[in-house]
Amino acid sequence: MVADNSTSDPHAPGPQLSVTDIVVITVYFALNVAVGIWSSCRASRNTVSGYFLAGRDMTWWPIGASLFGSSEGSGLFIGLAGSGAAGGLAVAGFDWNATYVLLALAWVFGAIYISSEIVTLAEYIQKRFGGQRIRMYLSVLSLLLSVFTKISLDLYAGALFVHICLGWNFYLSTILTLTITALYTITGGLVAVIYTDALQTLIMVVGAVILAIKAFHQIDGYGQMEAAYARAIPSRTVANTTCHLPRADAMHMFRDPYTGDLPWTGMTFGLTIMATWYWCTDQVIVQRSLSARNLNHAKAGSILASYLKMLPMGLMIMPGMISRALFPDEVGCVVPSECLRACGAEIGCSNIAYPKLVMELMPVGLRGLMIAVMMPALMSSLSSIFNSSSTLFTMDIWRRLRPCASERELLLVGRLVIVVLIGVSVAWIPVLQGSNGGQLFIYMQSVTSSLAPPVTAVFTLGIFWQRANEQGAFWGLLAGLAVGATRLVLEFLHPAPPCGAADTRPAVLSQLHYLHFAVALFVLTGAVAVGGSLLTPPPRRHQIENLTWWTLTRDLSLGAKAGDGQTPQRYTFWARVCGFNAILLMCVNIFFYAYFA
């Protein structure tokens, strides 16, 4: 039964793009291509190190901007606003938690990776444990995760934004974006990716600030946001249910460990495990730190990215909540027929929160600017995935199949891999059109919680426990994969019920939150890996030199690039500056957590 209290049509056509908006979008794309071509021309593209790691000569500010831009692709840009609209502030924990893990990347994981002189993280695993089976396992797993979660999420979210704001053909707009992104990624390698990421990050932040100011103005400021959100109830609801009501704990970060949608226990422990995989062991992210001129530049880049990661609360999540307050019949819909009219999906439309704000609140010209914010977010994330996936396949799989391959062949294969990824991505579009944006975001998180914890466990043991060996790590990964894959299959067979329906899923799904499952999977993998390592011979000292935290012997003070002008005194000074900023950053982070607790 549906209750209907509506008095007007919530689906009346919204504002359309003007000529000025189109001009702004065109100018942005021209600028983006120009920066890509410029950085490609100045890049050392004819060597493997130059193409895949930017010649190990990147400075801190483009690294930090690229880290932020790569993590805030259009999938998360729209997803964070949508999650804010659906459940409130707690989703900001996915960004704020990154502060500590990014510092761990720079001070711990990055030091190990740079000292081991690796190009890919699978290469590090091969050096640390020996053999090839773990390296191949991680390379294939990373490629699959990139294609079926990262590219999928970004493509769907980007296409959703383009469809709502521009009305362009779904396939045409997606293929055009993929083509432009792949063009500068193929030609320029990591240098082009990092510099265009830096440009796109600047545009993202400026545009998001403007929209956030406009959104807060609509509700008379931050002080009115809680009350406005609490009143965001759609006119048509499902009788005898409460799913149309905004959450009572919407303004709190820490939520009940049993009944909360994002329990504080899971957000503290489970999310940290997943974030460690993403920021410290995922090729897409770590590749930026590996390109640093020296360790200080890697540290400063992580600090800059951490400061930027504090922004999504005010620039994406709160505007998402405001969008629901302003447009409850569309963003907050619960009746399947109403949701289908609003966004083409029956189980909810929270993911249209951000593009709805853009089209309704932004004036002529600025509306085009905001579209030029979302498109670079999509392109930034896709370019990162293309480049890193190309690196993985070329360096870890192709070079294994053809050990005598020349540098020219490796570079050609790397570029061809990007073309193949484009084809797979386009073929995946029909699947994305049949999926709900919210379901896709939850699916991505579930996949991460089911597949990432074993990788985090093995990397953590490999870096901090000298006794860990290949046999223990391999069997730990297999055990974790078996358990994680089982949960994924169950989730696919038993999707979450819609509003008003009984939850008949198995207890492992209905009673065990995916963030809590991540903790259990991490512990299981670690236990198997430790047991297997203790039952087999330990690695010898020379096998783990410069590969664990306790066996570092290489002096990193003069950087990864010879002749970069660093002196020990200058290096020490900037190391102290980085250390001070890291402490300040953690204090700021703790303050915000406490304020919104």
UniProtKB/Swiss-Prot annotation:
Keywords, sorted A to Z: Cell membrane, Glycoprotein, Ion transport, Membrane, Phosphoprotein, Sodium, Sodium transport, Sugar transport, Transmembrane, Transmembrane helix, Transport
Name under which the protein is recorded: Sodium/mannose cotransporter SLC5A10
Compartment list: Apical cell membrane
Transmembrane portions of the chain: 17-37, 74-94, 101-121, 138-158, 172-194, 201-219, 266-286, 302-322, 368-390, 411-431, 445-465, 473-493, 515-535, 577-597
Membrane topology, as annotated: Multi-pass membrane protein
Record's keyword annotation contains Transmembrane helix: yes
Function: Electrogenic Na+-coupled sugar symporter that actively transports D-mannose or D-fructose at the plasma membrane, with a Na+ to sugar coupling ratio of 1:1. Transporter activity is driven by a transmembrane Na+ electrochemical gradient set by the Na+/K+ pump. Exclusively recognizes sugar substrates having a pyranose ring with an axial hydroxyl group on carbon 2. Has likely evolved to enable renal reabsorption of D-mannose, an important constituent of oligosaccharide chains of glycoproteins.
Residue numbers carrying Phosphoserine: S49
NCBIfam families for the chain: sss (TIGR00813)
Principal localisation: membrane
Extracellular side: 1-16, 95-100, 159-171, 220-265, 323-367, 432-444, 494-514
